[in-house]
Amino acid sequence: PRGAGRVNAPTITTAFTECVGGEDPSVQTGMGWVSGPELTAATANAGGLGIIASATMTYAELENAIVRTKELTTRPFGVNLRADAEDAAERCELMIRHGVRVASFALAPKPELIARLKENGLVVVPSIGAAKHAVKVASWGADAVIVQGGEGGGHTGPVATTLLLPSVIDALGGAGNTSIPVIAGGGFFDGRGLVAALAYGAAGVAMGTRFLLTSDSRVPDAVKQQYLEKGLQDTVVSTRVDGMPHRVLRTGLVNALESGSPVKGMLAAVQNANKFKSMTGMRWQALARDGLNMKKASDRTWQQIVMAANTP
């Protein structure tokens, strides 16, 4: 959907739509290089929650993206942040200043950051991959959580959505009684999935690839066509892309990474880190500090930290 007008569609009210102020319990996830102002605003105008991906943006680019999104929609939208980024606090202040409705996090933000956002009216929604993490962020004050199962694209875990989702819902109080809304992610792409998620006790669904393929996505049509031509057996979970389990399309590049040596993978990571540095305006010192923060916040090896440059 395009333009600033609301698209006529049935309203589905859940605890999550009441929390963020939308009409449709669908979340367009913050995908690096994909989720820009146009896609985010189009999702918001259709009644869902659109989320800007900020990890691949400089501070100034993020501010421009927020301003542009506000020009395209008057409806609530969000920004996805890396909780371990060096300037996470400054980016949160930017969101507060511009009246962004939702702060989405790929990793759990610190309790004091959650408190700062909430006291300024933002809804805090971390993504989690285990029931114990959902309980932890709920105790810290998170307003909702996104749960992504193993079917999801991008960074993913080993547990299927059909197993992970009910475990999280049960840990938070059970279907119809969760302490905070739970959004289901991983393998959802249409109304049937939404109905299934609601039946499990979720308050909505989060989708990435489905929104990547829309007309408002900035992804080139040639790339979209590759997605459309692939079948169920054409994705692979690889640790060779960036050192962490990552569901990607099986392409020539991925096959080369899978069959290549670890040394070549590390070399590619350094080269991609240099490209990422140029595209974001970050300095090597800032990249190194982010790497240290990532190491402290996770159990990744140093090889995985360096390899993470393959997919910012």
Predicted feature residues:
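Residue-level detector of alpha-helix initiation sites
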Residues: 34, 187-189
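Active-site entrance/lid segments in N-terminal catalytic domains of soluble metabolic enzymes
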Residues: 1-179
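Thr-Gly-centered strand-to-loop micro-motif
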Residues: 29-30, 52-53, 184-185, 207, ...
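Short, structured patches in soluble enzyme cores that scaffold and shape functional sites
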Residues: 107, 149, 184-186, 209
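Conserved active-site-proximal phosphate/metal-binding subdomains
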Residues: 7, 158-181, 189-312
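Conserved acidic functional residues
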Residues: 127, 186-187
